[in-house]
Amino acid sequence: MEICDYPSKCLVQNPVGKNKEIKMRRLGWFVGWILLNISSHIATSPTSWALDKSVDRQGIDARVLQKPPYNLTGKNVFIGQVELSRPTRFAVDKISNKLLQIDRAIVQPYEVFFRDGKAIPNKNLDDHSAQVAAVIISQDKIRRGIAPDAKLLSSAYSQRRQDGQPEACLAAQYVARQYNSTVRAINFSFGELLSEDPRPKPLLDGNALLTLCVDWVSNNYNTLPIVAGNQGKGGIPIPTDLYNGFTVGFTREVDGIYRQVDRGNLIDEPFIDRNDNGKYDQGEVFSDLNKDGKWTAGVESPIDGRRSLALLAPGNNLKLPTLQSKFKNVNGSSFAAPHVIGTIALLHEYANRQVEAGNWSIDARRHELIKAILINSADKIQDQGDGKILGMSKTILDAFGKTWIDTEAYTSRNIPLSRHLGAGQLNAHRAFLQYQAGQQLPTSPENKSLENIKAIGWDTNIVEVDKYQDYIFAKSLEADSYISATLTWDRQVKLNDKNGNGLFDIGESFTDEGFNKLELYLMRSQDTDISQSIWSSVSQVDNLQHIFIKIPTTDKYKLRVVFKSPQKNSPSQRYGLAWWAKS
């Protein structure tokens, strides 16, 4: 069984789901990073094309966007990929030229790099990176990628045992700077070891060099970082504690539909649920991964109860090509994350059309907005056909069969995301409908009674400290229907630029400048004080707020974005807001 082409310690999920470590040695040295694919093996008698399922209605429902009338394929949209290694590129790598004719190449990145320069021919190649890329840009007729015409820029960063966070940062920065900084999103399907972080007593507090770097790159170059979630026995959580992008977990099929969290995701310490109540009880057998003698929830999650896992996507039983274009079954969050990247490429292709036609401004390309769009349109509970659950296509389950309604996020104003489910599973079609609804502006200071927003829409705007922005629905919202609303904004990170060149260089560092305190309220349109709110999302540890709640009575409502003092950095805060309701 081939695990990964890199000399590494890899996590393997065998057919009965147990994890074991395999240590591989090459050239007398070890690499301590773990690729986030849990398994891969050659498929001999496939019964279905799992990638096609994961991209179609059984998964994220992106195929409909590739067909008329939309015809979205990611054309002319730049997206990035950073990993230890990279896919092959025809005319760069002899192995690619030898094995394939150009018309048979399934995965062809637009450009390939090594850290902050050109790729080294025939070096730093592996199957894992090719399989991640295939989810996005596969040209196979049956197993077509989500955005086959997107321009993928892929960079490898690791060549020696000591290569790690600084080198990965160089690669991310270099990718983001390409083509006048028009790379819309970057995929990170790898993790760095927390145990090797050089900080004293390192924590998942967002302050690892690579995590700071990823957030700085996002804010500085207007790109959305998407990170594969931690899994297996863990140990590789950096940069899953990022703020300005988000982390993706993976789902498995239930009766042919991707809709349940795979147990391979590392969220809580695994345990045997003897009484089948979906929670750990004293005395139940568990895996003590952190060796503290007690069961731990969120064992390798960000500190202070913060949840960076925002979305789920299919990642189990996918059939993806190797460097030799042989298809293998693979599982893991590594392959869930690029489902999000591919969807982003489709959205940006649509945005390009709208901008070129003069219908939208370039603000529609803001990464905060795309983040809000994706999260707000996720599937939670299947709609029954009356639109009261906003047309959601699937009920998403945690590993114990519980839904989002059963989570602490549903009942707490302080917790925007479920620890196990995030905001739900990616739905590319719903994300498109959310985006297509277009920008709608808040009530103007000149006319505070203006009721102007539709049931579905978005905005990207600025709010000043100690001020607020009101979004008043033009029509009454229907009782017992749900409303979903998501607010996102960036934390600020400063580059400690020793040589003043405006770029991160090896030996330099970053400083966390924190994030301002924004809150999101659902109110009746006539009410003026937030104490009168119907519901709110007021997390104190997140730069994201998310509301999903039933409308109590048919009435006029509004959303209010509030910037509370004291300011953490700038007195003006850019944000992205998306909403979906039934009127």
Which residues are covered by each model-predicted region?
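Subtilisin-like serine protease catalytic core
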Residues: 51-55, 64-167, 180-185, 195-198, ...
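Bacterial N-terminal signal peptides
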Residues: 31-41
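Hydrolase catalytic cores
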Residues: 157, 313-405
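Extracellular S/T/G-rich loop segment that most often corresponds to the catalytic His/Ser-adjacent loop
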Residues: 83, 239-349
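Calcium-binding acidic motifs and repeat modules
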Residues: 263-298, 508, 518-521, 536-539, ...
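C-terminal edge strands of extracellular/lumenal beta-sandwich accessory domains
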Residues: 366-367, 371, 471, 502-513, ...
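Secreted peptidase-domain scaffold signal
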Residues: 392-516, 574-583
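Gly/Ser-rich catalytic serine loop of serine hydrolases
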Residues: 121-133, 206, 326-342
